[in-house]
């Protein structure tokens, strides 16, 4: 698939045998390759300093079996780039660049696909691949940990959130992405802002909504997961809903709650379960699960109703390859 030809996640899933693989962590993978992301722009810093690295990591995930790759724009905002001294035009260009790099990686992957389906454990199979333009929350822009609390203060209203995100969404939607991945949504008000912006008409492509939880019951702000999902359910342009950046042990219970209030495909891409120290801005070692334990959950998630699976922070192409292998016998291809 190429930009703007995608409309229905259900149709896409028919082409992928009922299940699809989402890529894994980007920022933590950049760091694993040696990138220094100690910056308010976080992974978006690589759009300026090392676009070749972004291309490489996208390609690694495609060769691991990912059917959907997300652009390196989670923490990329016009306001964030302007705070670093970039002009409005340069800031918008960097947003577009995030999607262009992902689409170029998809093209590079297709070029590598020959008659062989694998090589050196690489999955080289021409198949429908979606490019999702990643959009993080207002809290991600603040880079103060509020994306993990959802607490923005009384001064942040629905209209202010819409004004903050509006132009960013327009630029990303016009950059050739197939859909927008609204990720790590921490509260109900921001979900409503995203739904309103999708319905305003300036954003011509659909999106998915993915929330995060720290207790396995509610989203991180304490808002009801079912109320948050209901906002997405009532927005026609939302084509899938689910959970990301949440420990694997919480996923099954959350999915069972989500399934009660949605008819849309359900996606999950948890983190490794490791704890993140927001004050020190680093991951706490030995607090998560390894790939083998992570992938052991996959069957339960599918049985609970999940059809799109991947990974978030601290997951790698190795994780995604293992998920791909788990799906082989479940797919109706």
From Swiss-Prot:
Gene3D superfamilies: Homocysteine-binding-like domain (3.20.20.330). Its cofactor is Zn(2+). Expressed predominantly in roots. Expressed in rosette leaves, cauline leaves and developing seeds. It catalyses: S-methyl-L-methionine + L-homocysteine = 2 L-methionine + H(+). It comes from Arabidopsis thaliana. GO terms for biological process: methionine biosynthetic process; methylation; S-methylmethionine cycle. Keywords: Amino-acid biosynthesis, Metal-binding, Methionine biosynthesis, Methyltransferase, S-adenosyl-L-methionine, Transferase, Zinc. NCBIfam families: PRK09485.1. GO terms for cellular component: cytosol. This is Homocysteine S-methyltransferase 2. Zn(2+) binds at residues 245, 312-313. In contrast to HMT-1, it is not inhibited by methionine. Its EC number is 2.1.1.10. GO terms for molecular function: S-adenosylmethionine-homocysteine S-methyltransferase activity; S-methylmethionine-homocysteine S-methyltransferase activity; zinc ion binding. Monomer. It comes from the Eukaryota. Residues 8-327 form the Hcy-binding domain. InterPro entries: Betaine-hCys_S-MeTrfase_BHMT, HCY_dom, HCY_dom_sf, Hcy_S-methyltransferase. It is an enzyme of class 2 (transferase). Catalyzes methyl transfer from S-methylmethionine (SMM) to adenosyl-L-homocysteine (AdoMet). SMM degradation (by HMT-1, HMT-2 and HMT-3) and biosynthesis (by MMT1) constitute the SMM cycle in plants, which is probably required to achieve short term control of AdoMet level.
């Amino acid at each position: 698939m190429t930009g703007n030809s995608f409309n229905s996640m259900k149709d896409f899933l028919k082409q992928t045998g009922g299940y699809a693989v989402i890529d894994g962590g980007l920022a933590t993978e950049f760091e694993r390759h040696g990138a220094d992301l100690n910056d308010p722009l976080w992974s978006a810093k690589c759009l300026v300093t090392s676009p070749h690295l972004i291309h490489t990591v996208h390609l690694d995930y495609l060769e691991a079996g990912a059917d959907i790759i997300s652009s390196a724009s989670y923490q990329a905002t016009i306001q964030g780039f302007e705070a670093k001294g970039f002009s409005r035009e340069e800031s918008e260009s960097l947003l577009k660049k995030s999607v262009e790099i992902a689409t170029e990686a998809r093209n590079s992957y297709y070029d590598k696909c020959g008659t062989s389906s694998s090589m050196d454990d690489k999955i080289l199979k021409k198949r429908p691949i979606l490019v999702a333009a990643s959009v993080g929350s207002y809290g991600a822009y603040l880079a103060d940990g509020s994306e993990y609390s959802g607490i923005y203060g009384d001064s942040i209203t629905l209209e202010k959130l819409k004004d903050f995100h509006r132009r960013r969404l327009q630029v990303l939607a016009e950059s050739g992405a197939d859909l927008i991945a609204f990720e790590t949504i921490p509260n109900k008000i921001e979900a409503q802002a995203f739904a309103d912006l999708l319905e305003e008409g300036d954003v011509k492509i659909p999106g998915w909504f993915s929330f995060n939880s720290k207790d396995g019951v509610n989203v991180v702000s304490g808002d009801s997961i079912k109320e948050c999902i209901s906002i997405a359910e009532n927005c026609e342009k939302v084509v899938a809903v689910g959970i990301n950046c949440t420990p694997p042990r919480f996923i099954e219970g959350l999915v069972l709650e989500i399934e009660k209030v949605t008819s849309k495909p359900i996606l999950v891409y948890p983190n490794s379960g490791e704890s993140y120290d927001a004050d020190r801005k680093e991951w706490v070692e030995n607090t998560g699960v390894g790939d083998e334990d992570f992938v052991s959950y996959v069957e339960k998630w599918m049985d609970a109703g999940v059809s799109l699976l991947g990974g978030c922070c601290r997951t790698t192409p190795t994780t995604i390859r293992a998920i791909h292998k788990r799906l082989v016998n479940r797919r109706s291809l």
